[in-house]
């Protein structure tokens, strides 16, 4: 499963990238706002750092506006993925932009029907939001399993990009189901390294080592 990092924080991306943990990056208007930087400037810097797909989101609500914004964003770098919402206008924009050979990430997906439409429209990625479904007392991972089954049934090439990830368990579940990609905040990816038994075992080793009075260097 590929790891995308969901942030516009250059330092956080660089730290994970140096460990080989970044296969791509996703951004959205909220993350750009949080960065406090110009969208084209920060996106260009991310694209120069990361070889994989970098999602930059349109903000127009009509298809023509999304298409025009998508084409403009695509000028930033060759690895730009144009992000559009899963609305009818977004599907129209996806069809045009993907037909031009551009990568398109259709976002804000909350149903298998929506994911099926996105695949038919030529989406490169579909981004189902699991955390927000969990907030509604639904199991967001059930949606990932449904989409995986549908895409496998018909050989769709659209990649399932699990989004709105809140925990390391979300990452594990996405991998078990067979998602192609999971995008998560830097903190969630780093939290995957944590386990209480690892900490407990390390504490025991350090206590015993101290008793030896030895030094390795």
Curated annotation (Swiss-Prot):
One of its GO terms (biological process) is carbohydrate metabolic process. Gene3D superfamilies: Aldolase class I. Its main location: cytoplasm. InterPro entries: Aldolase_TIM, TAL/FSA, Transaldolase_3B, Transaldolase_3B/F6P_aldolase, Transaldolase_AS, TSA/FSA_arc/bac. It is found in: Cytoplasm. The keyword Nucleotide-binding does not apply. It catalyses: D-sedoheptulose 7-phosphate + D-glyceraldehyde 3-phosphate = D-erythrose 4-phosphate + beta-D-fructose 6-phosphate. It is an enzyme of class 2 (transferase). The active site is at residue 83. GO terms for molecular function: aldehyde-lyase activity; transaldolase activity. Pathway: Carbohydrate degradation; pentose phosphate pathway; D-glyceraldehyde 3-phosphate and beta-D-fructose 6-phosphate from D-ribose 5-phosphate and D-xylulose 5-phosphate (non-oxidative stage): step 2/3. The keyword Transferase applies. Its EC number is 2.2.1.2. It comes from the Bacteria. CDD domains: Transaldolase_FSA (cd00956). One of its GO terms (cellular component) is cytoplasm. NCBIfam families: fsa_talC_mipB. Transaldolase is important for the balance of metabolites in the pentose-phosphate pathway. HAMAP family: Transaldolase_3b. This is Probable transaldolase. It comes from Jannaschia sp. (strain CCS1).
């Amino acid at each position: 499963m590929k790891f995308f990092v969901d942030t516009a924080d250059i330092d956080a991306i660089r730290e994970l990238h140096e460990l080989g943990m970044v296969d791509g990056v996703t951004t959205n208007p909220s993350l750009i706002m949080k960065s406090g930087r110009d969208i084209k400037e920060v996106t260009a810097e991310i694209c120069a750092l990361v070889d994989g797909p970098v999602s930059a989101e349109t903000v127009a609500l009509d298809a023509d506006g999304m298409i025009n914004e998508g084409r403009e964003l695509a000028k930033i770098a060759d690895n730009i993925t144009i992000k559009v919402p899963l609305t009818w206008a977004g599907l129209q924009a996806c069809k045009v932009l993907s037909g031009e050979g551009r990568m398109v990430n259709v976002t804000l997906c909350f149903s298998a029907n929506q994911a099926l439409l996105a695949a038919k429209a030529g989406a490169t990625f579909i981004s189902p939001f699991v955390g927000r479904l969990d907030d509604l007392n639904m199991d967001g991972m059930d949606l990932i399993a449904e989409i995986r089954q549908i895409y496998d049934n018909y050989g769709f090439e659209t990649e399932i990009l699990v989004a709105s990830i809140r925990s390391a368990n979300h990452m594990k579940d996405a991998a078990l189901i067979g998602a192609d990609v999971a995008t998560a905040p830097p903190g969630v990816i780093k939290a995957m390294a944590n386990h209480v038994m690892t900490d407990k075992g390390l504490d025991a080793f350090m206590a015993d080592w101290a008793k030896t009075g030895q030094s390795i260097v």
